[in-house]
């Protein structure tokens, strides 16, 4: 899947709040079941995003999987969701496990996530310090479409 060729991404409009609630929520539940503490800072989101739901889920699943491999379970995972200036941002930060042991990694997962986000018109930024790892996803956001007959 990784390479120069484009992925077969099919963008569709989604209510960002509903999609994030479901997809991010699934990852949070999985991590909590593994003993992680999640600290959420979720601002009210009222926008529409264009994503390929299956590929977006793949990005979020990869992040949750990486956290379960590399994050220190004794420290909280921070999840921030914000909507500002025409963009939706999801930021996930964790403390790095000091001795992860024998964990296979070729970092292809993160590169694929970056490619998926770029093809969906967004960004995937990762930052690592000595003890923290942070990923920030951004997607262009549009106002929610008002259904016919609805008033704001």
Predicted feature locations:
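Conserved catalytic submotifs in the C-terminal HATPase_c
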Residues: 10-12, 32, 37-47, 95
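A conserved beta-strand-to-alpha-helix junction within the catalytic ATP-binding
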Residues: 10-25
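Short helix-loop "hinge" at the ATP-lid/N-box region of the Bergerat-fold HATPase_c
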Residues: 66-68
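Short beta-strand/loop element within the Bergerat-fold HATPase_c
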Residues: 74-86
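Glycine-rich/acidic phosphate-handling loop/turn and adjacent ATP-lid/helix
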Residues: 90-108
């Amino acid at each position: 899947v990784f390479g120069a060729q484009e992925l077969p991404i099919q963008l569709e409009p989604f209510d960002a709040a509903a999609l994030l609630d479901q997809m991010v929520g699934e990852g949070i539940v999985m991590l909590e079941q593994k003993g992680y503490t999640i600290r959420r800072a979720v601002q009210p989101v009222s926008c529409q995003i264009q994503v390929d739901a299956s590929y977006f889920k793949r990005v979020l699943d990869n992040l949750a999987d990486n956290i379960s491999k590399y994050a220190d379970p004794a420290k909280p995972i921070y999840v921030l969701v914000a909507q500002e200036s025409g963009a939706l941002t999801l930021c996930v930060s964790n403390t790095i496990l000091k001795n992860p042991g024998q964990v296979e990694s070729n970092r292809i997962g993160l590169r694929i996530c970056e490619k998926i986000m770029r093809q969906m018109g967004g960004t995937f930024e990762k930052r690592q310090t000595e003890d923290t790892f942070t990923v920030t996803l951004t997607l262009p956001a549009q106002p929610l479409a008002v259904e016919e007959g609805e008033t704001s």
